[in-house]
């Protein structure tokens, strides 16, 4: 079996994690050569007063979170609060411990939040049920009531709502956070990521630009350059960014995403040497985003990047997926894909990659269905996911669930593309075959093949896929005794570069050998 899975096209857009996780990854630290005035900082005086009045775990955590965002971690009250938290080991959680350690500069050995390091299918089941997300929303509502002017709470709540597909509620919260603190790096990058998520790249670009810091802050500059690429434009910050990454005024970690974004620009221009050098610069002290971009560039464009062995990058699930696939280890890659999904449950990309691995490489249709279940939480009426979950459920003879998804697909109120309409017909054919209705199954598949032949794009690929699926069902229906179907399948001309189609046909041959 060929274990290649083509990674989706990638840009260095900002990841969006909950605030405490972002803090623990070091992405909100201040950087040299930029001195923000007191008027640019979100005031923490109220938090200090609350801490002095009531020295509790709750007050200490709140003060520390506000201090980190606003580059005030050296405040004596903040340091006192951090020490207080670490003295209450029996009353604090992992995130609170890590945040306090960060304040006291004991963060060198911090690990990614263990809550996202889940290797079992049970993790996917938890995300499908969304109980934890609803609990998170409930806790954040209480927090917002206590601190109605803290933008961080609204950003975190927006992320929780996006994870369960409530984009309108999420947008209201994002707008509130931007109103309270539009210059805040965490708020701006999270808001930009939200608008990219809902397809409004123009708004994302506007948010980053209006911070006023995208010409000085390397994290915001990286976002500006990448979002411009997504819009088919060239950022005005490229020249400034090139000067910045070779300046001694910035730490290697703070310019990692910037160097990666510039490397991607040069890669698209075809200047491979410049691209290689910039990617190598991004790997001096990478975060998970820049490391994944380098892995992607090596696979998709064969850029000869040097990735040091033994790099310990927190939450680098995506890059580990690509690395495992390069090593032809599908089982290891699905473990990392599940971690990635748990880390970014609102994002389609990890869901699509995880689905492809579990379906094409592992042929684990239960897992494929569960992965799509997570994707359908954040994208509840996505036609592709509804159809494909119906497909894998039908392949697994779970016909009731397959029919439920096809019913949802009929009423999803979204205009289907040509290829999606063909796939829907083919899936109806598969379900009919599994109901032992060969006549209807063959009729639906033949209609799908006919319609695929007249498609403007990807006609041959969609047609061949429908043919393979129909011939497989013919063979299964005949208990693999249909010699004409077998001969037709063997003689089917499949381009060697169409790995998914090659694997799909080989799967039929493998099943025949077991009979």
PLM-predicted stretches and their roles:
Residues 72, 90, 148, 182, ...:
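Short coil turns that delineate tetratricopeptide repeat
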